[in-house]
């Protein structure tokens, strides 16, 4: 499939992901490198791949006679410590949180559990964090660390340059899904499915500190072909479940040969993939924003898609964007 033949859409800017400098460990007025997005009620949760904090942003409210405006967010610490300020040193030390998903509550009454996952692209990027939400969808303060080593190890036999960039739960809550992002050295992106009940049991044990239990093995691995932009393969950056086994994806065409180094983003796309792994709808995004997080809501028989971007430069703020996709019904 050549995405040059697909629709072109211009995203609408919702706003930049701004924070108070006094709250940011580096004194920045924004969150950069946004890489995962989850909506819970009227809150947006955002992970960034070069931070130790989670960004929390409230849905813009409509003021009479004025357009909606995204207000400054707050930061919630995921991991202790401080990352180096130097770009090279920071890249080497960061846990690389590339994925964020919402899981069902593990027992206590709550709006669910957020799960941030490291990419697995380096040994120090194999940590996950579980964050419990209260019944209102706010972070409750309870969290647990997850060692992803045994979850990722079998995947390296198929993907030597593993790079987990997306994660979601199927609508019927039977499957836990990871998305591997390819690169120009190995352009294969993949949808990796697990039995949710097995993963759920493993995560509960991890949360209880039982680190000796090995993670479940994937039940299927689908190679996903997304096409090319100017000769550069599009690769998955995130996904979210839709009805009927379908799922929506975000993707970028980045000129890099591996999972660690950044490259020029020559194109970006969003679309819908069916249960068989076939792309049944896709559109390229005008302006080539490097979209790395996606959330979807059904509105007026259409899909309202919210995206966050990674500018690959800490001096620039990540952006929240919106587009609308047609419903498949």
Residue map of PLM features:
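Sequence/structural signature of beta-propeller domains
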Residues: 1-329
């Amino acid at each position: 499939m050549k995405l040059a033949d697909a629709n072109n859409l211009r995203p609408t800017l919702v706003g930049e992901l701004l924070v108070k400098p006094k709250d940011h460990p580096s004194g920045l007025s924004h969150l950069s490198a946004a890489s995962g997005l989850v909506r819970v009620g009227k809150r947006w949760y955002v992970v960034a791949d070069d931070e130790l904090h989670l960004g929390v942003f409230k849905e813009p409210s409509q003021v009479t006679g004025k357009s909606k405006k995204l207000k400054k967010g707050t930061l919630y610490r995921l991991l202790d410590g401080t990352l180096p300020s130097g770009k090279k040193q920071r890249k080497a030390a960061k846990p690389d949180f590339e994925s964020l998903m919402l899981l069902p509550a593990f027992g206590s009454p709550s709006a669910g559990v957020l799960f941030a996952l490291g990419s697995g692209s380096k040994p120090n990027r194999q940590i996950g964090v579980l964050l419990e939400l209260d019944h209102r969808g706010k972070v409750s303060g309870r969290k647990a660390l997850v060692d992803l080593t045994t979850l990722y190890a079998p995947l390296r036999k198929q993907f030597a340059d593993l790079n987990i960039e997306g994660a979601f739960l199927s609508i019927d809550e039977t499957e836990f899904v990871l998305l591997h992002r390819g690169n120009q050295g190995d352009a294969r992106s993949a949808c990796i499915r697990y039995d949710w009940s097995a993963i759920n049991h493993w995560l509960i044990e991890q949360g209880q500190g039982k680190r000796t239990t090995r993670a479940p093995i994937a039940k299927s691995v689908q190679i996903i072909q997304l096409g090319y932009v100017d000769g550069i393969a599009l690769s998955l950056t995130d996904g979210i479940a839709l009805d009927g086994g379908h799922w929506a994806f975000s993707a970028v065409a980045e000129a890099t040969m591996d999972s660690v180094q950044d490259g020029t983003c020559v194109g970006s796309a969003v679309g819908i993939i069916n249960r068989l792994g076939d792309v049944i709808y896709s559109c390229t995004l005008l302006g080539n924003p490097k979209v790395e997080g996606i959330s979807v809501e059904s509105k007026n028989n259409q899909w309202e898609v919210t995206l966050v971007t990674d500018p690959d430069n800490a001096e620039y703020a990540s952006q929240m964007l919106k587009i609308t996709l047609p419903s498949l019904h």
